[in-house]
């Protein structure tokens, strides 16, 4: 009997496997979702399974908390303006060392441990991410002031060729969000936005934001207020009405950016929920919030 | 919580999916296992799922009961010698019409209904199965007598080219066990033996016999006596000791034939058990009997 | 001298071989043209030769007389409305068994015997023919009445992928005209119409109707009245003037359907004429009637 | 009736077309066989037909008579030793101009005129024929004397890559027998021998020598003494017994060279016989002499 | 130190190598530029180097002086009208023998000697150049008179398929400017014009005219008056003002023809300047005159 | 004149470009050779040029000095035994961050800046380097003692698939020498030895050690004592005689390892010499020491 249930559950996944066969899913794997070994294992197994059943995950990861820790170790105080890290030369060096030299490799190792073949990359390789310095404006005394965030960039162009090759050869690409400008300078990118840009360029079907919240909720302390499905206009309405505020707003903007770039749906799931990615994709009800254009 | 269990079950399949990735499994789908709609649906879903997760099923089907019914309708009495159907011209016509014209198409339809792409074939297409008339001997009064079974054949050569093309292009081939001799005459083949021959020629990893028994049991009425794993020598021992008798013996010979042809393991499962194929492949304990060389 | 003539005849075919190189010809092989062994050999040899000289035949076959015989054997009376077979469940079963289980295999065998590589298929495999139930209307007392023909369908969509693969790999596809509707039900198709639909979908250059008449004649008893070449408007004119009547009209409609679907020319030839297909294609004068758009 | 005969003749070619499908035939087209326009047309049509029915002709041509004429026009006297043209620098220039600049192009033109796609080459292109200076010995007063033939070479290595590409892309290569030594000097090659070397390197099934004789005859004036099939040992026997003498001996040696290099059969046919190549290949009895190893 | 200079020079070529990577350059190699062994070596080495660094040269050669010499040897007087050779049948034969049988092969040999893989072709092979008889008009007594130049043609269509294959397989094609009309007659083509036509058809980036002058100069005796870069309108201006006259005008027209056909720039360089092709391409200043559309 | 010299120098490289076309060169780029911006530019330009002229560089880099600096900044003292870095967990983290997160990216950036397409990798991606913990022995009081170096490994297996794909798609792979053991733990590898192992696995023609010495010299202060070419036995002789001592010995062992693994020649060049790689490859005399088997 228990056996039968197992089989039924496998079979339940079949329509989803058929539907998403050969599609690309961009997984934005946030630093806050990498809280413990177990959570990291859940994600890794989910992504390897996706790959084996014919869906192509492409990972863009963050690493904010770890970067902060490394900075503090070196006696530097992290500073953010509008959710973007102020990045001087020394900070950029730390960002790259932590993202590319540590977190990226850890994700690759986990994926390979569970049977996947992964390739760690930054936006520097194969001219993957061409970026330009981001000009940030701030309103002060009802005047627009230009703020210098340092070596912070925004995506100008994504050259998908290298990723296409790797995906086609059955690798899972794992990308650190560092871009290069036309002078060859590295730039620190916001991982959420970059993920949306890459998803759009790759014609990804879905962008799945693996975060540390369950999704968009009316009341963050009440799981029953979680929205399963929202349209952009509903979200804009919620922002206007003050239901969505603070740190969530830049993430929401990244979601809308992805939809604008051609992604069909964006999903916010909680990396601390066991196998959240798999459940969001392979079950009717899902576990997080799905955002669609309309 | 229930969600979590679902995901865990999917993930449990991962090592098996990795291990069998890109391999070929020959599914011998027996006529006695096609007892009802539900059982046929279970098998079809299992095979489509296998295909989508990167394992390549190739189906060889039987159809004995249905052939008998058709013959009786036409006023002919089915006759068997040593488990092989005596096949005159008229019988051969009925065999072909039922196998190729009915059962094969029904299997193809089921597979396509659940999202697979299937192609129905007989051994006549693409010179798939070159056969020769089978010479059957009988011991009578301690004398070896040659028996004429009529248009009954045994496989001489399997040309895998057509199947290779179809498998590579992501189709599930469904094969009726009719062969052709060098004069172009059709011959009725024993589906169990033919399945083993095709499995060997295709370098299939497994031959899965979907039957109407749970496997090899010491006492057919006591499920607890089911053997999970047997070697050829253990089986030979069981035959010698009289544990395996009667109608099971030709099937066992077909299993040994497959192992001789290079198949790594043969599995006997019960098509009436829900999702028997999936459970046999994707769970540690399995549901039937696995036979290996040693 | 005789030798020389032989060579000259081979060479005469050269311009046609050049002209039609790599093109696809849809051969509608009618049940009435399969009258005897010799006639079946002629056709088979013609098609194998076409394949070897670089022209790609695709066969769609009928089988009306054989189906009628099988039905009568089972005590059923064939019934037709407007040339379409009224098809209840039992009839459909017989149609499939005869077409797929018998005639299709016989054609495949013949082709393979003369050196071709053939693959027998029905519209069920590889989602080849998606069909829908045909709604037939009848005029009665100047009122349009809807007639239920049972499991009779018309082609909704032809998925050419499987055929393309087989043709490219140098197989001759032989197709039984059975389609599948969106619920997975099989439907009996008119072979003439289906052949035109497949020809159009495959971008076939020619549709060759192998029948039991020499072509379109003003007087069916006077061979000298055979038309070698007709345009659609000439044919419409002949119908209006009553030169073409009765059973020929549905066939003519099938020809016009094929031209509408993009076929360059439709040819009606007599399968009882030795090597009619070859002669129609490879000689200036031809042996049957060619119909072109204008 | 006449129509029927035509078709039968086409069909008679079928077994040969099947048998030789995709094989390569090396056609040595001798200068003496290019006697008139009509004969040149026969050969060209034969080769184009071969190509279209799936057999791949590769042409190596001679041009002795035309070279002699050109030399005489320039006031030079052709000189031969053991059938090899003594070749000083000026002669080599004439040889190249006539072979590459005239005869090769004429053959290409004829082939293209009848629907073929041909490419004219010499052994200079694509390092096709690496040659070395031929050391010729002469017995004089029972002493072996080395003779300097000038710029005459023998094949050292055939690089088949260029020809393989052209054949695969459906071109007919037409090759002038000029080789290049390791210092980059051009060398005049004996076309018969070179044809055998190229045939061997290309794994050609047949070498067909298109000459101005009907084959090997016991009495050159009695057509009835023509041998249809000979083995090497039979030929050696004939030479010993004096049946084969004079100018025929070097040609025979070229035939044996080809068989040694792996060609299955060598055919000697008369280019003045209409469609000799076609008849030799596509009829049971042939028109010339076939030589096989044993 | 000297070593360092060597390396610097190699490195200086890098931006040009990057820029022109995988592009096609049409090299028109004029007969007047083949003056001596050394000059021929320079060109050959330049082209082989280009090929190895990833730029694809395609050579169209002339051979006027050599043709004249051959004609005179045969007692014929070369005759030109408006720079086009009057070409009777005998002249055409000489043209083909010299161009295809001699000069083409010499270029191929040189290229192969320096490590290239070259293939000699005329416009006759692979239907490369389809031409038509050129109608030439002359003004006489202010009347337009049609002049018969004999077998002189102009390009009607270039079939790039053969060249594409050869370039892709890493060969350097060397083309003699002989075309074929629709009746299969060979026609003598002006090499300058043909080179432009082929360059356009092949989507060549550059047409490089290797001549015996340094480029376009205001005063042909004063090297310092050489124009490095000119636009079409500047050139037209120069012609109008009488700076460009005589034999240079047809060459200029050929340049403009190439630009019209889509070539990005045409270069006139002096084949007697050591490595003129390399220097023109790989140095900032160049050595000849570059002509661009505007 | 100067122009001519430039061209001559380009042409001088031609034989080397031909000879090494399509081969793979493993470049071991040592940390001591990355002393200044200019030296890093020289190397980057050299490698990009190699790639463009058809030679495939694969880079394995070191980074010792930079790792030391980073460790010291964090208050850790680098410790070496027999030239291998003692590597505790914290050290390994620093090693990875510096190698993968900083140096690797810097090399990639330089290569891309000069027109190359580079991909940064560690041995973790695509299961590139499977390693095992290195057991190091020390002789102490004439007793062999096992020393624990911590997370230090040696290459067990190189999976070339990912590199093969990247090389074939025209990328320059840049590899940080970090391996993974069977438990998924990262291990710090000696870059010299790893470079030889990868070179052998990739069938590289050459291993070029870019160091901070000019090569092997009898007297390190006397440039004139530099050996241009040495065999293994000559080197062993020099070691025995005490000409090669100290820090050079492990490097020499790495060279011999590479030759053992099948590399044809190992070159030691000085990264501070302008364009040392290019000069070593493209000039007769070279600039460093070449070591060959015999």
Swiss-Prot record, chains A, B, C, D, E, F:
Function, in words: Catalyzes the ATP-dependent phosphorylation of N-acetyl-L-glutamate.
Pfam families: AA_kinase (PF00696)
GO biological process: arginine biosynthetic process via ornithine; L-arginine biosynthetic process
Pathway info: Amino-acid biosynthesis; L-arginine biosynthesis; N(2)-acetyl-L-ornithine from L-glutamate: step 2/4
Family assignment from sequence similarity: Belongs to the acetylglutamate kinase family. ArgB subfamily.
Coiled coil location: none
The encoding gene: argB
Protein known as: Acetylglutamate kinase
Lineage: superkingdom: Archaea
EC number in record: 2.7.2.8
Entry annotated with the keyword Transferase: yes
GO cellular component terms given for this protein: cytoplasm
Sequence positions that bind substrate: 63-64, 85, 188
GO MF term set: acetylglutamate kinase activity; ATP binding
UniProt keyword terms in alphabetical order: Amino-acid biosynthesis, Arginine biosynthesis, ATP-binding, Cytoplasm, Kinase, Nucleotide-binding, Transferase
Record localization: Cytoplasm
Residues marked Transition state stabilizer (site): 28, 251
The UniProt record lists the keyword ATP-binding: yes
């Amino acid at each position: 009997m228990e056996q039968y249930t197992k089989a039924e559950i496998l079979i339940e996944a079949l329509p989803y496997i058929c539907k998403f066969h050969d599609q690309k899913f961009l997984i934005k794997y946030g630093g806050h979702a990498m809280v413990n070994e177990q959570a990291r294992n859940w994600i890794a197994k989910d992504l390897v399974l996706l790959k084996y059943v014919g869906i192509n995950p492409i990972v863009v990861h963050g690493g904010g908390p770890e970067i902060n820790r490394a900075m503090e170790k070196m006696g530097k105080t992290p500073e953010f303006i509008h959710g973007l890290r102020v990045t001087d030369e020394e900070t950029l060096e730390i960002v790259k060392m932590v993202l590319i030299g540590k977190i990226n490799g850890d994700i690759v190792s986990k994926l390979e441990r569970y049977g996947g073949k992964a390739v760690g990359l930054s936006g520097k390789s194969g001219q993957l991410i061409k970026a330009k310095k981001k000009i940030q404006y701030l309103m002060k005394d009802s005047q627009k002031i230009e703020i210098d965030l340092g070596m912070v960039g925004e995506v100008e162009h994504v050259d998908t060729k290298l990723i296409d090759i790797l995906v086609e050869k059955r690798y899972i690409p794992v990308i650190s969000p560092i871009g290069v400008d036309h002078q060859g300078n590295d730039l620190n990118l916001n991982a959420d936005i970059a993920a949306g840009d890459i998803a759009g360029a790759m014609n990804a079907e879905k962008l799945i934001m693996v975060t540390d919240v369950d999704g968009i909720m009316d009341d963050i302390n009440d799981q029953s207020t979680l929205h399963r499905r929202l349209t952009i206009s509903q979200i804009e309405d919620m922002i206007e009405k003050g239901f969505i505020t603070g740190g969530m707003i830049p993430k929401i903007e990244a979601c809308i950016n992805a939809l604008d770039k051609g992604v069909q749906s964006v999903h916010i799931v909680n990396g601390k929920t066991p196998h959240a990615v798999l459940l969001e994709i392979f079950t009717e009800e899902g576990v997080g919030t799905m955002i669609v254009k309309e």
